[in-house]
């Protein structure tokens, strides 16, 4: 697997992530089971975005010093594009979490605890998926065509899909988990497991955590191939992906109260997936530069938010 990642870059990335996670977990322990306020969510979102951009700047500077601008510029652009793709696709993941918490009636104060472990699990699972994907691409480059076709299909499916939280309990996976886990009927404070009559029982909070992890894996199947369309370098794919999901918990609490105001977002994300799928399928005929890909993704997001604002304005005017 060809990569610009040196031991210094890998080590620096690991240290930054470890320190930030330690700070986040320490603050979580001090606050206990309290919901993150909108102000705190906005502050943490800004911290994670700023940290990601600073890392990319340091990454670019390091490559300028060691490889030159000809290498540094496209690699830094690849990181930024991958980060933007993952960050935008992660919003749909957040909306699924909202449906899960709503369906299982998880109090806001306990949602934070679930998401702490959910994000930690996502880091481990995505790291495994990215290195596996990088190895497969290095051995079988035709897999990129499969990724492209899959993203094209997923984009169309996303645009046509109708999300309904009322059927979550009837999903085969949920029924299977409930049938195979010894589980209580009610949430017991912040506990994932409780003891009754000497036996260990999972609580519904544990079921929600499992579903949060599985939903992230499902979304990673979309987002990780999307970043491979930009670069196959495992260092850039992993760092851009993990920096994007590290801010997911803060993003969740930032968007939780206004999710219904983003009705058009899934269509914008669907267009992004279709564009990336086409980019992967035509790579042998025409190579779309990274800067163009970044511009297209950013442009689609801007247009989506403009259309969304217009739709919200029309709805508010009709209600008003």
UniProtKB/Swiss-Prot annotation:
GO terms for cellular component: plasma membrane. Disulfide bonds: none annotated. Keywords: Cell inner membrane, Cell membrane, Membrane, Transmembrane, Transmembrane helix. It is found in: Cell inner membrane. It holds the Pfam family TerC. Residues 28-43, 111-113, 157-198, 247-261, 308-320 are cytoplasmic. Residues 1-6, 65-89, 135, 220-225, 283-286 are periplasmic. It is a multi-pass membrane protein. The keyword Cell inner membrane applies. InterPro entries: Integral_membrane_TerC (IPR005496), Integral_membrane_TerC_rswitch (IPR022369). Its main location: membrane. The chain crosses the membrane at residues 7-27, 44-64, 90-110, 114-134, 136-156, 199-219, 226-246, 262-282, 287-307. The keyword Coiled coil does not apply. PANTHER family: MEMBRANE BOUND PREDICTED REDOX MODULATOR, THYLAKOID MEMBRANE PROTEIN TERC, CHLOROPLASTIC. Belongs to the TerC family. Has been proposed to be a redox modulator. This is Putative membrane-bound redox modulator Alx. It comes from Shigella flexneri.
């Amino acid at each position: 697997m060809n990569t610009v990642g040196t031991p210094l870059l890998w080590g620096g990335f690991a240290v930054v992530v470890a320190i930030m996670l330690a700070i986040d977990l320490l603050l979580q322990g001090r606050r206990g089971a309290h919901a993150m306020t909108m102000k705190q969510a906005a502050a943490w979102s800004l911290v994670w975005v700023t940290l990601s951009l600073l890392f990319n700047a340091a990454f670019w500077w390091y490559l300028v010093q060691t490889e030159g601008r000809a290498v540094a510029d496209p690699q830094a652009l690849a990181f930024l594009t991958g980060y933007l793709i993952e960050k935008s696709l992660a919003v749909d993941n957040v909306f699924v979490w909202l449906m899960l918490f709503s369906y299982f009636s998880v109090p806001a104060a306990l949602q934070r605890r679930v998401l702490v472990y959910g994000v930690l699990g996502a880091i481990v699972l995505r790291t495994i998926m990215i290195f596996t994907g990088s190895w497969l691409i290095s051995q079988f480059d035709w897999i990129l065509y499969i990724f492209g076709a899959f993203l094209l299909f997923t984009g169309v499916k996303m645009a046509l899909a109708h999300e309904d939280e009322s059927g979550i309990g009837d999903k085969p996976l949920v029924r299977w988990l409930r049938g195979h886990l010894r589980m209580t009927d009610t949430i017991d404070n912040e506990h994932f497991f409780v003891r009754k009559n000497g036996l260990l029982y999972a609580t519904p909070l544990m079921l929600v955590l499992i579903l949060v992890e599985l939903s992230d894996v499902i979304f990673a199947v979309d987002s990780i191939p999307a970043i491979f369309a930009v670069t196959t370098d495992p260092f850039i794919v992993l760092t851009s992906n993990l920096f994007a999901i590290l801010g997911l918990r803060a993003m969740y609490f930032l968007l939780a109260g206004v999710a219904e105001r983003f009705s058009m977002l899934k269509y914008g994300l669907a267009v992004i997936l279709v564009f990336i799928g086409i980019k992967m399928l035509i790579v042998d005929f025409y190579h779309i530069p990274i800067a163009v890909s970044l511009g297209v993704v950013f442009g689609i997001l801007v247009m989506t938010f403009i259309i969304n604002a217009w739709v919200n304005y029309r709805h508010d005017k009709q209600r008003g």
